[in-house]
Swiss-Prot record:
UniProt similarity note: Belongs to the RNA polymerase beta chain family.
Pfam family, one: RNA_pol_Rpb2_2
Subunit structure: In plastids the minimal PEP RNA polymerase catalytic core is composed of four subunits: alpha, beta, beta', and beta''. When a (nuclear-encoded) sigma factor is associated with the core the holoenzyme is formed, which can initiate transcription.
The UniProt record lists the keyword Protein transport: no
Described purpose of this protein according to its UniProt entry: DNA-dependent RNA polymerase catalyzes the transcription of DNA into RNA using the four ribonucleoside triphosphates as substrates.
GO annotation (BP), single: DNA-templated transcription
PROSITE patterns, per the entry: RNA_POL_BETA (PS01166)
Matches recorded under PANTHER family: DNA-DIRECTED RNA POLYMERASE I SUBUNIT 2
Subcellular location: Plastid
Protein's UniProt name: DNA-directed RNA polymerase subunit beta
CDD domains with a match to the protein in the record: RNA_pol_B_RPB2
Domain of life: Eukaryota
Molecular function GO labels: DNA binding; DNA-directed RNA polymerase activity; ribonucleoside binding
Amino acid sequence: MLEDGKGGITTIPGLNQIQFEGFCRFIDQGLTEELYKFQKIEDIDQEIEFQLFAETYQLVEPLIKERDAVYDSLTYSSELYVSAGLIRKASKDMQEQKIFIGSIPIMNSLGTSIVNGIYRIVINQILQSPGIYYRSELDQNGISVYTGTIISDWGGRSELEIDRKARIWARVSRKQKISILVLSSAMGSNLREIIENVCYPEILLSFLRDKEKKKIGSKENAILEFYKKFACVGGDPLFSESLCKELQNKFFQQRCELGRIGRRNMNRRLHLDIPQNNTFLLPRDILEATDLLIGLKFGMGTLDDMNHLQNKRIRSVADLLQDKFGLALVRLENAVQGTICGAIHHKKIPTPQNLVTSTLLTTTYESFFGLHPLSQVLDRTNPLTQIVHARKVSSLGPGGLTGRTASFRIRDIHPSHYGRICPIDTSEGINVGLIGSLAIHVRIGNWGSLESPFFKISDRLTGVRVLHLSPGRDEYYMVAAGNSLALNQDIQEDLVVPARFRQEFLTIAWEQVNLRSIFPFQYFSIGTSLIPFIEHNDANRALMSSNMQRQAVPLAWSEKCIVGTGVERQAALDSGSLAIAEREGRVIYTDTEKILVSGDGKTISIPLVMYQRSNKNTCMYQQPQVRRGQFIKKGQILADGAATVEGELALGKSVLVAYMPWEGYNYEDAVLISECLVYEDIFTSFHIRKYEIQTHVTTQGPEKVTNEIPHLEAHLIRNLDKNGIVLQGSWVEPGDVLVGKLTPQVVKESSYAPEDRLLRAILGIQVSASKETCLKVPIGGRGRVIDVRWIQKKGGYGYNPEKIRVYILQKREIKVGDKVAGRHGNKGIISKILPRQDMPYLQDGRSVDLVFNPLGVPSRMNVGQIFECSLGLAGSLLDRHYRIAPFDERYEQEASRKIVFSELYEASKQTANPWAFEPEYPGKSRIFDGRTGNTFEHPVLIGKPYILKLIHQVDDKIHGRSSGHYALVTQQPLRGRAKQGGQRVGEMEVWALEGFGVAHILQEMLTYKSDHIRARQEVLGTTIVGGTIPNPKNAPESFRLLVRELRSLALELTHFLVSEKNFQVNKREA
């Protein structure tokens, strides 16, 4: 918390605040702006006029609750009503009605939207800001070529370039360019105006020939010349209105509309004073841009850095929703126009309500949330994941970059990112550097820029002391880089401090400093701010840690970290997983479903989340932390959520770890664990799987949900009720029926059983033939049924389709194959679970819980884990928790090492454990082999770091194929666990098998188990009858496919079989 100039307190802003502000700006301003753009609609004879009144729009409170929208697959939306008027000019009567024009998805308290029952988030997009940018490139001869790129608000680009002869060209396409005089004339300027408004008229006149004069003799000639170059049309086209309209739609509207931000940038770069409401590119802009380009040619002026954040803008959720609302109104305008014409043609009297359809706005937003690249399914693995996802900023998407074409310079860290975009937290893989995360204190300004706060170094009498500066503005100040937490001006700083000035790092006297950062974590994202001792880690490992914390599974019994950074509480508060008291009062009732609070004569019911499934199948829940009769204050925590303890983020567990090799079981990042982690449920987590089935109408009739399923064993349907649906609370195993369903089908006369034919012949009873299509528990799906949802939707022709969802809760202990990780990029796979008596143990008799490989530390340069490990041990012995700010070496040299050693020394003295700190090898200790009782040869580093269990679990990945589908072309098994696919034996695997000489196993893998059709059939027959499986004598299907492919290239390939006995050649067709 920081003191501002008015005596108030400045804290970390709400981490979801950017999403809330964007949506509120759309509701308050965006809707009104687009409704004002809605033009009056008239019929052909101009007898009827329709218009919307933007001042009187109204949003209705959603009719359903968030929880019901999730469970029933509905959209949590608000209905929009606008007053509309229909004027009949003959009688001058106006009929006004409040009409419903559609539903708009509403943002909830998490900063997300619920569309069709799915939580979705609209992430911010960072784009090149509209305006003009000058740059220089070297041509093939090493000569600098200067260009000016004009970027429109739509993302379209036009380039001005100057050649060796100082001629100015405007490039309208990749291959076509025209003279700047032709472009200016086509935009409405004559030659005299051009000469009078440029600084270098002699340069423009130097290449003006008779042919050029004819082209710019009139506006029509200039437009025709421009159209020929732009549309690549030969001959002499004739001037017409349609030609001008085509140019307007395809060029001027897409490349010359600057928008509000573009006009501001253009005025600032070219030193113009054109009004802000004039958002189109003007001839004056072109001429001023030409002057500046000529000046750059002669060494005057400066080039632009297009990767600087002052040349970027943020396209927030408000801009995206406003664009889609404008698109829906354009569609509505066309629909109303057609409806008016149809009503007049059929001589009907229209009303405003009859003219407007609400489906256009609703379907526009549903398609946006479902199909737009920037609208993504909210990642809800743990509370931290939700916050980080909402604070992402992407360079991808419409109008942005692509992962294939983005250069290294665009992906790299820029000095202007400091305090605005985290230099650590980004995606791994092809999108590295293109998807970033906003810094913890950043905010979005009015012009779409990222603003970072700074503390102003001045006298106490000056006004506000915390300034929010946009990119570029802070470069004019001396900004102290390494400064302490205290902002009291009376504290004497060092005489010389490091500082930033104009993207350079300097060392200056303290008196010259103008600004300083307000928080040690100001430069990092929320995920990176949770890493203690981050300054001792390599940046690549810090990046991995930021990403892996988002993959941590909420555990059954969470635990606060011993060593943290202090940001854990803010992350938990803004995640929405906690229940917070909205007013003072007294708790009168509490259970697992709700908390009742009485205050001011009112009783408020606060519902709690109980066993809610996230989209990553993790279990979200809330546990009450207050008692009946307890008095509470506003803002007090009433209930903890998943992965939170006492209002702090708790993603993992602090366990006893030793860094040592152990019989090769922790080779190459493998991890050895004790069985007590399994039996004591240390890393046990709950997961909820959702299984769904839907009834359809077939040509033979509707499908039926029932518990009378023929040809199924009784124990498979033991859990079904009378309706054929599994009972809530049942324990189910793989293969059990969750929902019994029969599908009618056509059966031939010959396929009836004898008793069925007898019933038909004697009694005339029609035997129904149905196919069993039940919903069954898949392999690895055992668990407890915690919820069953039966959803009926209204269908046509008197049939209501049914959708049944079954939720199964699974308890998963940690096992071999699961992935665990620390907070420093140190990750590994469980390789073996040892009995606790075989694990290494300490001098006080405690056995180690987990063994890491020490070779994983020096090469990866993530030494922060060593500090956390040792300080965690001291904290567990002293029963203390530490919150460490990053870059503490600015206070004194070796500050991290000193605090760790001092705490270990204090722990060894106060707890009578002298082994905790041994001066010969501080931080290490002599430990014993649990199998023999002997001490290990060398002292071992032991401690209590914070370990996370990640979502990558072996239960979701392990797979074996007994039988399955084959690809149609290659006849080889499909790929992937979901398709019951096989494991590919590639080229290198074949080499390995050849190296060991296992010829029969290799032949089996390449024929029987792969794509030899006849051999597969013979294996089945031989298995049933018994005997020896014969060796395949012809080529497999993949070889036959290769032959056919070569034949398509007119290459004939034949093969021969040579007998081993008499070497006779037997030729067969491939």
